[in-house]
Amino acid sequence: MNYKVFCLVAIALIVGSIGSANGQAAFTEEQCSVERLARVNCGYSGITPQECTKQGCCFDSTIQDAPWCFYPRATPEY
């Protein structure tokens, strides 16, 4: 009986940690479409997409000679 409870708690913790990135919601495509010259580096050389998004940043490795991990575009306040 205790083993079943332990397994359920472990599964809940794993699913919960996978579903959240340090409380950061995923950014929209618009927020992460930042021009090459306007990108402000948010990571380090060799950072993985997972590490980058965990830091609350955008990751895009399709543009050469630009930071791949960078701060998202600020959202306008209404």
From Swiss-Prot:
Residues 1-23 form the signal peptide. One of its GO terms (molecular function) is growth factor activity. Keywords: Disulfide bond, Growth factor, Secreted, Signal. Stomach mucosa. It is found in: Secreted. May act as a growth factor. Disulfide bonds join C32-C58, C42-C57, C52-C69. Pfam families: Trefoil. This is Putative gastrointestinal growth factor xP1. It comes from Xenopus laevis. One of its GO terms (cellular component) is extracellular space. One of its GO terms (biological process) is maintenance of gastrointestinal epithelium. InterPro entries: P_trefoil_chordata, P_trefoil_CS, P_trefoil_dom, P_trefoil_dom_sf. Residues 30-73 form the P-type domain.
